[in-house]
């Protein structure tokens, strides 16, 4: 190997990449063709793809039958988005050439990038028919299916790859296998592979995947351990806070669940789901005022956040704060938000506030959506009876009785009303 190339390598290894590239550039004119190929590979590894292409393009013209050079040239062209040119270069390699399977892999990669998954799959199977036990081909098939969301298929090929290698192209095979199993709903099967992946490469994404999957598998303590470790490693990894909070909740640690959700809000202040979850935990442990405040903040982020609205309305209803129910619904309606349950809440609130005309209008509007809801029908019928509207209440009571099957008190009420009308 040329001494200037050796010097350039030493400079880059010492962290002086710019000097290394300059030294390599100075060496170009005195390099033999074999060393030019080495220099091109170094340029590529050090991030100067254009210089790598300049050298390899000339070498490819000089040695068109050197198919390893051809594949490398195509790989460089793919890197600069010259996909059609790369494909044309790859198609010059004959099927009988030892480098042909590699060219098929590169073609498959190209077609996958273009969204032509079936063509990509065909190229990979063609390569596999030549080299049946090559882990790189199995891994490429796994990656193809993984990219398509066909996780069960991906599992098959990642498992085969994992028997031979734990890493390919800088990708941890055990992590990919674990992710595929988890995405397939095979949470328990994913756990041992996540354990291996975290041992080999404890990066935040792998730890998160492990913790999240452990929670899905019901291994709550493992989930808490992994997600807590991740929080310590990178507290700004916002996705960890919801599953960690839910893990604490599953252990009955509601205070810790609330605390964790609020920590998450500090890093992800526009996450309405975290506000809602924190509110539910606050309400669960009797912190009603804090719960209401968190729900109001969730609604400030999204006035149409239905679950937060329903939760806050339920709190107001439990606290018999009927004015707040009316004010909240009127406010969200002013934003153009609507939900069938609003009329039911309004009907109940107006009834309690003795605003009977408004209550009747709200019941009538709600009936369009809740005519098959037993609790609504009973409440509506009770309101009508209180208002002396027995004739209107009667069909509702009969419907409730039909749903209940047997209800002596209800039967007596119906008979009494029918008797009054028969006189």
Swiss-Prot record:
Gene3D superfamilies: Tetratricopeptide repeat domain. Disulfide bonds: none annotated. Keywords: Repeat, TPR repeat. InterPro entries: CellSynth/LPSAsmb/PSIAsmb (IPR051012), TPR-like_helical_dom_sf (IPR011990), TPR_rpt (IPR019734). It comes from the Bacteria. The keyword Mitochondrion does not apply. TPR repeats lie at residues 33-66, 67-100, 135-168, 171-204, 238-271, 272-305, 306-339, 340-373, 374-407. The keyword Membrane does not apply. Interacts with the RNA polymerase core. PANTHER family: TPR REPEAT-CONTAINING PROTEIN PA4667, TPR REPEAT-CONTAINING PROTEIN YPIA. This is TPR repeat-containing protein YpiA. The gene is ypiA.
């Amino acid at each position: 190997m040329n001494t200037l190339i050796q010097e350039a390598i030493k400079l880059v290894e010492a962290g002086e990449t710019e000097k290394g590239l300059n030294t390599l550039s100075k060496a170009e004119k005195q390099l033999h063709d074999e060393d030019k190929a080495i220099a091109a590979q170094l340029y590529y590894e050090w991030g100067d793809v254009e210089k790598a292409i300049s050298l390899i393009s000339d070498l490819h013209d000089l040695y068109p039958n050197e198919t390893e050079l051809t594949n490398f040239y195509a790989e460089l062209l793919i890197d600069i988005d010259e996909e059609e040119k790369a494909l044309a270069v790859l198609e010059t390699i004959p099927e009988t050439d030892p480098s042909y399977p590699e060219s098929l892999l590169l073609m498959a990669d190209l077609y996958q990038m273009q969204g032509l998954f079936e063509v990509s799959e065909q190229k990979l199977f063609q390569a596999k028919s030549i080299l049946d036990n090559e882990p790189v081909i199995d891994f490429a098939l796994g990656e193809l299916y993984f990219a398509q969301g066909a996780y069960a298929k991906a599992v098959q090929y990642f498992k085969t790859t994992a028997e031979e290698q734990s890493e390919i192209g800088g990708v941890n095979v055990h992590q990919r296998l674990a992710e595929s199993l988890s995405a397939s709903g095979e949470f328990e099967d994913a756990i041992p592979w996540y354990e291996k992946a975290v041992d080999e490469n404890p990066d935040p994404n792998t730890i998160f995947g492990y913790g999240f999957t452990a929670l899905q598998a019901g291994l709550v303590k493992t989930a808490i351990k992994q997600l807590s470790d991740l929080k310590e490693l990178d507290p700004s990894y916002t996705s960890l806070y919801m599953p960690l909070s839910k893990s604490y909740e599953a252990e009955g640690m509601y205070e810790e669940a609330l605390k964790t959700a609020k920590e998450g809000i500090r890093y992800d202040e526009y996450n309405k789901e975290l506000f809602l979850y924190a509110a539910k935990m606050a309400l669960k442990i009797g912190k009603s005022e804090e719960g209401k405040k968190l729900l109001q903040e969730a609604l400030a982020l999204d006035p149409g956040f239905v679950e937060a609205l329903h939760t806050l309305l339920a709190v107001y209803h439990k606290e018999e704060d009927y004015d707040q129910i009316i004010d909240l619904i009127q406010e969200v309606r002013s934003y153009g938000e609507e939900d069938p349950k609003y009329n039911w809440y309004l009907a109940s609130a107006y009834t309690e506030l003795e605003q009977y005309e408004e209550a009747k209008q709200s019941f009538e509007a709600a009936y369009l959506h809740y005519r098959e809801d037993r609790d609504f029908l009973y409440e509506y019928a009770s309101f009508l009876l209180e208002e002396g509207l027995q004739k209107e209440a009667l069909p509702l009571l009969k419907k409730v009785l039909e749903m209940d099957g047997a209800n002596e008190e209800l039967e007596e009420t119906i008979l009494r009303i029918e008797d009054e009308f028969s006189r």
